[in-house]
Amino acid sequence: MGDIFLCKKVESPKKNLRESKQREEDDEDPDLIYVGVEHVHRDAEVLFVGMISNSKPVVSNILNRVTPGSNSRRKKGHFRQYPAHVSQPANHVTSMAKAIMPVSLSEGRSTDSPVTMKSSSEPGYKMSSPQVVSPSSSDSLPPGTQCLVGAMVSGGGRNESSPDSKRLSTSDINSRDSKRVKLRDGIPGVPSLAVVPSDMSSTISTNTPSQGICNSSNHVQNGVTFPWPDANGKAHFNLTDPERASESALAMTDISSLASQNKTFDPKKENPIVLLSDFYYGQHKGDGQPEQKTHTTFKCLSCVKVLKNIKFMNHMKHHLEFEKQRNDSWEDHTTCQHCHRQFPTPFQLQCHIDSVHIAMGPSAVCKICELSFETDQVLLQHMKDHHKPGEMPYVCQVCHYRSSVFADVETHFRTCHENTKNLLCLFCLKLFKTAIPYMNHCWRHSRRRVLQCSKCRLQFLTLKEEIEHKTKDHQTFKKPEQLQGLPSETKVIIQTSVQPGSSGMASVIVSNTDPQSSPVKTKKKTAMNTRDSRLPCSKDSS
């Protein structure tokens, strides 16, 4: 009885040992033998988690015994049923893979960033059967095979897109999450893998070998089919990294905006705006040497008064005005007492005096010829047609002082050449040194018909003097400072005043240099006019 009880005690440990062995054999049945990380292409830094078909049998740690039949059972199992999913040798890439983000990568990315899995599209790689796993085919696969994942993360950024890539939507992947098996707990030494959440935008794509030519006519994305662009159309870019995608998108936007700016931008500079007074009017100080004060006196033949040069000029002016009032002719009522210009009617004369000589406010008046105009635009057109930039027709014959305004020359002579031996004619700015010729010259200006210059207020007794005056004095004497350094073909905008925000201000565009008259034509015209001007002189002399 004691021997039997001892045998039972000895047999019970053996039975427990068999049960533990059987339990270990059952634990070794899962099809997944080894999940490894294989560097398929080191240049692109591709990480591949694949399934190795030529796996070795598991060595049992108990009694150093190899589990019998494990290798043959696996070869005869699922791998023969699904030959299309057997992984290729090391120089090939598995044709079927599902994209699953590692835990370390998924934690660093945002939930809305796309996850893309793609195989190498270089010519050196071949794929036995490239295909897209549909929901129907994935359901027929065993759970162990469905969990095999090839996760490839492109570090170099090459081959980021291929026109013939095929994609599955997120719903197709998430519908099979319940059938997947976690590999993290069962396999030591393998990085833990996590299934992509349903709210994460993920993309699965398998690329066929291509060399930049689009073979497929469309692609599927989020369940909607989009046609691929033609070979002549724009290239389709599918960036794997969302950060690089955003940076490249910003770069493309900046380049396009610069291009648009370059198209709309005018390379030519705008025409410079110059004031009318700066463009047409000016002064020249002349020699700048003061004349010697001689205190010469002059005697009037009418009233026998002896006066110095400036007072004698004023005295002669009063004699001329008194002579006009005494005659009481029509011409006296139509001639301006300031500029000695004659007008058709007394009303026009009075309007001229009010607008030009005694005007209180700014008006459209040409300072060179002392004529008033209705608007500033008419004044600008007059300046463009009749005057040149920097024109100074009024000249002091003593010191060569010049100005565009007659009043400046008269004031200059009265202040700078006072108490000298010179007398100035206020009709033509001619100089005299004695009283009798000066008085006769002034009487001729008032009694006979004079030649009015068409470009200024001066009046001449002979045509020769008028032509000489127009030829010498009505030219550009000094170029305006605003035009210095500008090319000759530059267009300049002339305005009466420059005010900010005045878009409707009167203006006119003038060339930097106006065409000058030919010297040959000027000489011919001068000679002809000189010959004609001699005829009236001969009649008067006779």
From Swiss-Prot:
Zinc finger (C2H2-type): 334-357, 364-387, 423-445, 451-474
Keywords, sorted A to Z: DNA-binding, Metal-binding, Nucleus, Repeat, Transcription, Transcription regulation, Zinc, Zinc-finger
Pfam families: DUF4195
Source organism superkingdom: Eukaryota
SUPFAM superfamilies: beta-beta-alpha zinc fingers
Sequence segments annotated as region (Disordered): 66-185, 499-542
Subcellular location: Nucleus
Biased composition (Low complexity): 128-143
GO biological process, alphabetically ordered: regulation of DNA-templated transcription
Biased composition (Polar residues): 107-122, 499-520
Basic and acidic residues bias: start-end ranges: 161-185
GO CC annotation: nucleus
Sample GO molecular function, one term: RNA polymerase II cis-regulatory region sequence-specific DNA binding
Function: May function as a transcription factor.
PANTHER family: ZINC FINGER PROTEIN, ZINC FINGER PROTEIN 280A
Protein name: Zinc finger protein 280A
Organism annotation: Homo sapiens
Gene transcribed to yield this protein: ZNF280A
